[in-house]
Amino acid sequence: MNKRVLLVIFFVTLLIADEVNSFSFFRKAKGFLKKIWKSKIARRLREKGMKALKNYANDVINGPAEAPAAAAAPEEPPVEQRRRRR
């Protein structure tokens, strides 16, 4: 999955949990949503979201990680250009 998608899913789940806890209308659904929140899938999504958030924050603070020079393709020697006669 894309990092942005994981971040969006992470924040949406946090917002849903906050809204459920703040409204008394959802008291009956609160237990069901707690089960969903504690499920394995939700935990994995939160973990991935936290990792993506930490990586994004590190990229913003330190700049993007550069690829090592050995992995880069070797540069070709410059091609000599012929002079045009005017």
Curated annotation (Swiss-Prot):
The keyword Signal applies. It is found in: Secreted. Expressed by the venom gland. Keywords: Cleavage on pair of basic residues, Hypotensive agent, Metalloenzyme inhibitor, Metalloprotease inhibitor, Protease inhibitor, Secreted, Signal, Toxin. GO terms for molecular function: peptidase inhibitor activity; toxin activity. GO terms for cellular component: extracellular region. GO terms for biological process: regulation of blood pressure. Residues 1-22 form the signal peptide. Residues 67-86 are annotated as: Disordered. Inhibits angiotensin-converting enzyme (ACE), but does not serve as substrate for the enzyme. Potentiates bradykinin (BK) on the isolated guinea pig ileum as well as the isolated rat uterus for contraction. Also potentiates in vivo the depressor effect of BK on arterial blood pressure in the normotensive anesthetized rat. Belongs to the non-disulfide-bridged peptide (NDBP) superfamily. Long chain multifunctional peptide (group 2) family. This is Bradykinin-potentiating peptide 25.12.
